[in-house]
């Protein structure tokens, strides 16, 4: 069953959290759900170059809180926070309420090559540049291993290398225990648009097991997480709507 069900949905409330955190009546629930979907599509379309890994949305009364996990926070923040103001205006326009209070938090992803969505995005970019899929997968696996992941599985489907007949190829390195509920599995999908058609990409990343409140992450011997020298993870919290 663990191989059929969505890895994130299976672990909600155990090792994964909901992407939308709010409660609503049955009457307003569909409207708010569609609103969340529009916000996410707007952010990924407009800021695709910022390496956005995840978008978390929370609601408190009439306030909307959006948390962005990104590999390049500087692209979102901009000079003196101008990017935040532009993003807020875009979200207000997307929801159709220019007076909506929007609070934005930008969080930098610590280990870029250990993030499933960013890995899938990297693979899609390489495939769209017509790089051979086997070479692309091998490079992605090497990047993830250097980042210190415990296991990785990558699957690519479609007309690989322009073949006449579509097929599915996959590879796995290390452990990816899909049946273990306490396993911290990061899962993402991505679509690559090529001249031969679209290719579907799926990435599973095993980061360790969560026992109690702490994640037991055992880095492989010699593994060194890929981080830019001299920089620490940053979190930019937007407080312009307070007071």
UniProtKB/Swiss-Prot annotation:
User: Spans of biased composition, class Basic and acidic residues?
Assistant: 234-243
Annotated segments matching region Disordered: 217-243
Recorded source organism is Synechococcus sp. (strain WH7803)
The answer to whether the entry has keyword RNA-binding is yes
Give the Gene3D superfamilies listed for this entry: 3.30.300.20, Ribosomal protein S3, C-terminal domain
What functional role does this protein have?
A: Binds the lower part of the 30S subunit head. Binds mRNA in the 70S ribosome, positioning it for translation.
Cellular component terms (Gene Ontology): cytosolic small ribosomal subunit
Gene Ontology BP term (one)? translation
Drop me one GO molecular function for this one: rRNA binding
**Keywords assigned by UniProt?**
Ribonucleoprotein, Ribosomal protein, RNA-binding, rRNA-binding
Q: How does it assemble?
A: Part of the 30S ribosomal subunit. Forms a tight complex with proteins S10 and S14.
Q: Which segments constitute the KH type-2 domain?
A: 39-110
- Family of the protein in this entry: Belongs to the universal ribosomal protein uS3 family.
* CDD domains, A to Z: KH-II_30S_S3
Can you say what this protein is called? Answer: Small ribosomal subunit protein uS3
